[in-house]
């Protein structure tokens, strides 16, 4: 039987059904091919073609290539572990690719796998790569698969859940794995890899299941790219907020009594307050009204909103007598109650309610991660109630506010617009009008954006912002979401010029997103060296010796009265030690005082980078810092 195949150049050829992409690549003279894309599905070179299709080929230079070679590297890792620890002692979990790498989960019986073992595992992987074992894909019956994996309980569990009568397996040498692919043609294609770490991971992410050993790794087509990535990881580890947070006395975590619920220490609270004050100032200027809504509300509210039916597994509940309450996972129902507390005319719109609202959402312990993934967090949530004709201008206002806030921290960002999914509520004409309003607002703001067709929420289109930090990593933070569902569920209306009730449009919007997460991003973005305006301590006053302490106290008091956050370090430690401690604490400025300074009334100032400025007039120092703080400058003025 013949099938028609459209080639990369657009030409069409006929081949026998079962022809492999490798054979077509060889025939048309395309070299250095490692895989294929068949009708937008990643496809092994040795996997037969069964239908009419369009094909293009993947080389190591193509963006699809990492999915092939990192997936294969995960299998090479598993094969190496089984060789070293014994096939009978290793129970295999799963081994997928992830962003910039891969991992494999193992249940090691009669032994233990730690980070000290990674070098010898790497050596065994290099042997497997050198062996250049052919990788073969097979489709077999479930019964055959159960026989092959009869000693692999986790694989048997997966086989039971696969729909249909057949499954796919991959073989390389003595190693066989249950897998959908895709993979390289052999183990010797990519040689540049590194095993990175070992951690615990519950099977399938559930605390009810056994804890497995997860080994993380990365791989690249070029040695240079691997080396650059390892340097990037080294820098990222230095900036890790989980390390810097406690070191800088910003926050702490207690997994025994409050997993996923950060404790903010005095210095961390200063940063949070500065972030909130900055945001409040901008919101007041733009006509937002700040409100506070209850943390706990009756279950009936959450039944109306739909959270009870669709989000209950992520919520916390409280029962008291006959009543049942929920700890709020979102702020929107509370804001709707505020809106509905009085009659609203079209003349009152738009109404912009804003809240730093604490919410709680259950997350599995295995996915909790410092401040980035938590169970308790604060959202800078706002809800705008407006008429359909006001959507475009309101979105434009939010875009301007987002840009103002992100620019203040030196962030650039990327924008995505997600449109109507197949499963949606509301009239398609309303969706089209709303989506066009979002597009027009983005165009008027001059923002380039990518459209994600069909990726909107079922209750409305949305705009997402991905900020880029100093290491080039992207973080999804701000969201603008149009909602057609909540206003209908809660009968959110206004009296129009025709004296009739009309359903209001509701715009959800957050900019920091989670205040805690944004704080964590800032720690890593600035490596803990915050701009002076948000630095927990702005000036460290350091007397050279005990006899200079009284003079140092007077200087510290004077600076404090001028509104600066000052730390007087008059401990009986060496001067060098105290200066180093101030630098470790990332304090922007150090004022060092000895005989010369106290007699002249002029300051010796050091910046945290080590720059020294002598004979600084007190008034000049105060005026310079005040302007730096008032203008919320990113750089230290005295370093310029």
From Swiss-Prot:
Record keywords, A-Z: Aminoacyl-tRNA synthetase, ATP-binding, Cytoplasm, Ligase, Metal-binding, Nucleotide-binding, Protein biosynthesis, RNA-binding, tRNA-binding, Zinc
Cofactor remark: Binds 1 zinc ion per subunit.
UniProt-listed GO biological process terms: threonyl-tRNA aminoacylation
Cofactor(s) needed for function: Zn(2+)
Domain TGS: 1-59
Coiled coil (residue ranges): none
PROSITE patterns: AA_TRNA_LIGASE_II (PS50862), TGS (PS51880)
Enzyme class: ligase
Documented EC number(s): 6.1.1.3
Subcellular location: Cytoplasm
Pfam families: HGTP_anticodon (PF03129), TGS (PF02824), tRNA-synt_2b (PF00587), tRNA_SAD (PF07973)
Gene3D superfamilies (alphabetical): 3.10.20.30, Anticodon-binding domain (3.40.50.800), Bira Bifunctional Protein, Domain 2 (3.30.930.10), Threonyl-trna Synthetase, Chain A, domain 2 (3.30.980.10)
Cellular component GO terms, alphabetical: cytoplasm
Residue intervals passing through the bilayer: none
Catalytic as annotated region, ranges: 240-531
Catalysed conversion reaction: tRNA(Thr) + L-threonine + ATP = L-threonyl-tRNA(Thr) + AMP + diphosphate + H(+)
Keyword Nucleotide-binding included in the entry's annotation: yes
PANTHER family: THREONINE--TRNA LIGASE, CHLOROPLASTIC_MITOCHONDRIAL 2, THREONINE-TRNA LIGASE
HAMAP family: Thr_tRNA_synth
Function: Catalyzes the attachment of threonine to tRNA(Thr) in a two-step reaction: L-threonine is first activated by ATP to form Thr-AMP and then transferred to the acceptor end of tRNA(Thr). Also edits incorrectly charged L-seryl-tRNA(Thr).
Protein name: Threonine--tRNA ligase
Annotated source species: Thermotoga neapolitana (strain ATCC 49049 / DSM 4359 / NBRC 107923 / NS-E)
Gene that this polypeptide is encoded by: thrS
């Amino acid at each position: 039987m013949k099938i028609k195949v459209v080639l990369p150049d657009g030409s069409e050829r006929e081949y026998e059904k079962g022809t492999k992409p490798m054979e077509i690549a060889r025939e048309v003279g395309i070299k250095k091919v490692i895989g294929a894309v068949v009708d937008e599905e990643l496809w092994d070179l040795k996997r037969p073609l069964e239908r009419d299709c369009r094909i293009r080929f993947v080389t190591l230079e193509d963006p699809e290539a990492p999915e092939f070679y990192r997936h294969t590297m995960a299998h090479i890792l598993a094969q190496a572990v089984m060789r070293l620890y014994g096939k009978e002692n290793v129970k295999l979990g799963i081994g997928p690719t992830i962003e910039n790498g891969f991992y494999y989960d193992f249940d090691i019986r009669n032994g233990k796998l730690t980070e000290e073992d990674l070098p010898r595992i790497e050596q065994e992987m290099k042997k497997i790569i050198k062996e250049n074992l052919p990788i073969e894909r097979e489709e077999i019956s479930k019964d055959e698969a159960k026989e092959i994996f009869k000693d692999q309980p986790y694989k048997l569990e997966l086989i039971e859940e696969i729909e249909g009568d057949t499954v796919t397996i991959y073989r390389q040498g003595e190693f066989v794995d249950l897998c959908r692919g895709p993979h390289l043609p052999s183990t010797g294609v990519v040689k540049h890899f590194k095993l990175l770490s070992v951690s615990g991971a519950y099977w399938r992410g559930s605390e009810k299941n056994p804890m497995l050993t997860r080994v993380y790794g990365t791989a690249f087509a070029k040695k240079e790219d691997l080396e650059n990535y390892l340097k990037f990881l080294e820098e990222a580890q230095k900036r890790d907020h989980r390390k810097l947070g406690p070191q800088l006395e910003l926050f702490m975590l207690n997994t025994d009594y409050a997993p996923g619920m950060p404790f903010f220490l005095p210095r961390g609270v200063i940063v949070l307050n500065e972030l909130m004050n900055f945001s409040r100032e901008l919101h007041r200027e733009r006509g937002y009204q700040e409100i506070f809504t209850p943390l706990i509300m009756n279950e009936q509210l959450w039944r109306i909103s739909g959270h009870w039916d669709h989000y209950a597994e992520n919520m916390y509940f409280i029962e008291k007598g006959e009543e049942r309450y929920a700890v709020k996972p979102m702020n929107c129902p509370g804001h709707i109650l505020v809106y509905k507390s009085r009659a609203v005319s079209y003349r009152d719109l738009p109404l912009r309610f804003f809240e730093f609202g604490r919410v709680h959402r259950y997350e599995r312990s295995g996915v909790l991660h410092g401040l980035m993934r938590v169970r308790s967090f604060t959202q800078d949530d706002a809800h705008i109630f407006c008429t359909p004709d006001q959507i475009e201008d309101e979105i434009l206002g939010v875009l301007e506010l987002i840009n103002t806030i992100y620019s203040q921290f030196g962030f650039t960002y990327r924008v995505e617009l997600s449109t109507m999914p197949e499963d949606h509520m509301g009239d398609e004409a309303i969706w089209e009008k709303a989506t066009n309003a979002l597009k027009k607002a983005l165009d008027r703001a001059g923002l380039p954006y990518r459209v994600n067709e069909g990726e909107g929420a079922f209750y409305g289109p949305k705009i997402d912002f991905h900020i880029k930090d100093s290491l080039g990593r992207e973080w999804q933070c701000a969201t603008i979401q149009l909602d057609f569902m909540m206003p209908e569920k809660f009968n959110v209306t206004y009296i129009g010029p025709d004296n009739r009730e009309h359903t209001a449009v509701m715009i959800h919007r957050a900019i920091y997103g989670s205040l805690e997460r944004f704080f964590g991003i800032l720690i890593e973005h600035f490596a803990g060296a915050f701009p002076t305006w948000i630095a927990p301590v702005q000036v460290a006053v350091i007397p050279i010796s005990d006899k200079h302490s009284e003079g140092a106290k007077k200087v510290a008091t004077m600076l404090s009265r001028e509104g600066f956050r000052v730390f007087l370090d008059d401990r009986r430690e060496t001067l060098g030690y105290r200066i180093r401690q101030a630098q470790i604490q990332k304090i922007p400025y150090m004022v060092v005082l000895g005989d010369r300074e106290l007699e002249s009334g002029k300051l010796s100032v050091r910046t945290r980078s080590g720059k020294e400025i002598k004979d600084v007039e007190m008034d000049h120092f105060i005026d310079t810092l005040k302007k730096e703080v008032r203008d919320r400058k990113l750089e230290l003025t005295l370093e310029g």
